[in-house]
Amino acid sequence: MVFLSSVETDQRKMSAGNHSSVTEFILAGLSEQPELQLRLFLLFLGIYVVTVVGNLSMITLIGLSSHLHTPMYYFLSGLSFIDLCHSTIITPKMLVNFVTEKNIISYPECMTQLYFFLIFAIAECHMLAVTAYDRYVAICSPLLYNVIMSYHHCFWLTVGVYVLGILGSTIHTGFMLRLFLCKTNVINHYFCDLFPLLGLSCSSTYINELLVLVLSAFNILTPALTILASYIFIIASILRIRSTEGRSKAFSTCSSHILAVAVFFGSAAFMYLQPSSVSSMDQRKVSSVFYTTIVPMLNPQSIA
């Protein structure tokens, strides 16, 4: 009878693939050293304030200035909105955790944070590619710019960016909800992300890890290659500019954008384009700071 009861219990656990024995998690945060918490709080509070002010200013300025109602600034305002949302999903909770003893997040709140984080992270990848393509058309095909980048095309490009974000996030979160999380309730991260949550699973994570690698390859490498190709053509066009002043101005504008893009895709690739066993979670936490907080702060200054 005891054996049968044990078997029935195991079967119920296996069939409850979309449930977790954990009702709340403890976020380990960036550092466990108490003396660093206040310094980290002040640092990331400053970064978040700059991010919010910079991106809101960009959106407001573009919205109120009729002469900025062009495809380029339309995409820049869209990118600022994504950056604002991307940072807001992560940073406020992280700031609270710096000044509280127990960094608790409920299971539903954790899954919600994961879902919206993935939407805007994936959307940012593709929006950066769209802005690079827009610059390529403007510089390399200026006579066809108004035809290629019509408002109709701009609208559908933006829709495509969000569709890819929602689709990718729904797939990842849906498969995450199927896992039985029971090893521990401590997430070794400062927010609910894919690999830290997979590490808590008592059931097989093979499909989840395969999906992370496949979808990350598409959502990171495809936009990155699009941006790389766009800037190769842009730089080739810049080199044909006879004016030294015009060439240096164009290079300075592009270099700041390339730097922000390189930091974003480089840190994202380090986090998601390798198996979880390759690098430590502490290394991944440091890497994730760049694409969750640093790049959203830099984008308004580097891309405009």
From Swiss-Prot:
Protein name, entry field: Olfactory receptor 8G2
A family per Pfam: 7tm_4
Membrane side Extracellular: residue ranges: 1-41, 91-110, 176-193, 239-257
Domain of life: Eukaryota
Transmembrane region(s): 42-62, 70-90, 111-130, 155-175, 194-214, 218-238, 258-278
Glycosylation sites noted in the Swiss-Prot or TrEMBL record: 18
High-level lineage: Eukaryota, Metazoa, Chordata, Craniata, Vertebrata
PROSITE patterns assigned to the protein according to its UniProt record, in alphabetical order: G_PROTEIN_RECEP_F1_1 (PS00237), G_PROTEIN_RECEP_F1_2 (PS50262)
Cystine pairings recorded for this chain: 110-192
A GO biological-process term: sensory perception of smell
UniProt record similarity statement: Belongs to the G-protein coupled receptor 1 family.
Alphabetical UniProt keywords: Cell membrane, Disulfide bond, G-protein coupled receptor, Glycoprotein, Membrane, Olfaction, Receptor, Sensory transduction, Transducer, Transmembrane, Transmembrane helix
MF (Gene Ontology): G protein-coupled receptor activity; odorant binding; olfactory receptor activity
Localization, UniProt: Cell membrane
Sequence ranges on the Cytoplasmic membrane side: 63-69, 131-154, 215-217, 279-304
Membrane topology listed for this record: Multi-pass membrane protein
Main location: membrane
Main function: Odorant receptor.
PANTHER family named among the record's database cross-references: OLFACTORY RECEPTOR
Gene Ontology annotations for the cellular component aspect, listed alphabetically: plasma membrane
InterPro entries, sorted: GPCR_Rhodpsn (IPR000276), GPCR_Rhodpsn_7TM (IPR017452), Olfact_rcpt (IPR000725)
